[in-house]
Amino acid sequence: MSNLTYNFAQKIRWFRLLAHSRSSKLNEEVALSLLDKLPSKSPVIFDIGANIGLFIKAFNKSPHKPKLIFAFEPSTYVYSVLRLTVSRFKNVQCFKLALDSKNGTTTLNMPLKKSGSIRVGLSHIGEVSKGDYLQESVETKLLDDFVEEMKCDVIDLIKIDVEGAEFEILKGANRTLTEIRPFWFVEISETKGRFNNNSKDTFKKFLDANYAAFYFNEQREWVAVQDYVNENDFLFVPKEMLNGLNI
C-alpha cells in the first residue's frame, strides 16, 4: 500500500475506503450538472483534492465525458485507493502532489479517530488543532507552474476540495485564474487557525477576478450569490461566459 507504517485499524479503514470507492454514487448529481453547464462537451478537468476518486467516477458518467482529468491527491494512504478507483478510466492522470502557494514540501496532517483509523476527509496542510495526527511530508507545486509544465492551454473546470487551503492554491494560480479562465467548483471551508486568511478572502479573490458565484441548493438548482455567508461548495463562472449559459 505504501512505505508508511499503518496500524491494524488504519489497514481495515483502507479496505473499507476501497469498497466505498467502488460502490458509492456520491456527488453524481452535482457532477453531472457541472459538466452540463460547461461550454465544452469534452472538457479538460483538474480535480484538486481528488481523495478516493468519487467525483472522477461521477464525471465519467456524464454524456459530456471529459477528454482528460488531472487528479491531485498528496496523501500516500488515500492516493493508493485513488489509483485503484480510477484505473479503468483511460482519461485520468494521477499526481501525488499538493498544489500550494510555493514549490517544495509541506506537512500533511491526517487526523486520527480514537480507534486509530484515519479521518480521511479531514486531512489538511496548515496548523493543527488538538488531537492525534498521522503526518507525512508531501511535495508541493504552484498550480501555474504545473499548468505550464504540462502545456495546458485549455482547462474547462477546476474542482478544489482541500480542507481550508483553497486560498493557498489561488496564490499560485494567478495566470490560470486570469488568463486561462476555467470554471471553478470550490469547497470553501473555514480556515481559522491554519492560514493568515479566511474564507471571505477566497470568495473575494474570484469576484475580484471578474467571476460570478453560484451554489447548488436543496432544490438542485444553481443560485447566484453576491457575498460569502458561510462555507459551501461554490461554482465560479467567468462573467464573460454568462451570456447564453443555462444556469
Segments predicted by a language model, with ranges:
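Phosphate/nucleotide-binding beta-alpha loop and adjacent structural elements of enzyme active sites
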Residues: 1-247
